[in-house]
Regions:
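Donor nucleotide-sugar recognition loop
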Residues: 164-171
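Short, high-confidence coil segments that cap the C-terminus of an alpha-helix
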Residues: 10, 59-62, 89-93
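A short, N-terminal amphipathic alpha-helix
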Residues: 1-12, 24-29
Length: 171
């Protein structure tokens, strides 16, 4: 909450959580929280529910939604601002903060989601496995690691929320 507030302002920061204790804490320090269902499989589902709740409560129509997953408490305000600034291009529907690494431990760690992008920086593929992979295991390569910080246009978030889980996600 604190770091996000530094990036986009307290008035533009809302915590979406299924945990009453977290919601109460956020509200005790003057923040806004939306209690959501505990049944969500993806963080984007929780955020989409929160957007719908905010709009139904008279909060107006949300245009851009920045999402910082709860396991990313150390993301700096400047990083979040960079992701949100991507949305100044009307053609951008989703922005995903990634960082490059050549550290083999980070690359093979299944807790790190890796992403392959095309020349226009569109995400092609996400994996917990080491991607891209080299046919020659002795080659040193780099990868892009997803941080858990995203920005969505409202419509893109709600559309993404409606998509069925893909076969790749089920693996």
């Amino acid at each position: 909450f604190h770091r996000t507030s530094l990036a986009v302002g307290r008035e533009n920061t809302v915590v979406a959580t299924c945990d009453v204790e977290i919601a109460e804490y956020v509200e005790s320090i003057g923040g806004r929280a939306v209690l959501t269902s505990s049944d969500h499989e993806r963080a984007t589902n929780r955020v989409a529910e929160a957007v719908n709740v905010l709009e139904a409560d008279g909060g107006g129509c949300v245009d851009i939604v920045a999402m910082v997953q709860g396991d990313e408490p150390l993301v700096g305000p400047e990083s979040l601002r960079r992701v949100v600034e991507c949305m100044s291009d009307p053609d951008v529907q989703i922005a995903n903060l990634v960082y490059p690494t050549s550290n083999p431990e980070e690359i093979v760690d299944p807790n790190n989601v890796k992403v392959v992008i095309d020349r226009l920086k569109n995400a092609l593929y996400f994996s917990r496995a080491a991607i891209p992979a080299s046919m020659n295991s002795s080659n040193v390569f780099s990868a892009l690691i997803q941080t858990g910080v995203f920005a969505f246009r409202r419509e893109a978030l709600l559309l993404f929320n409606e998509l069925e889980e893909s076969n790749l996600e089920k693996i």
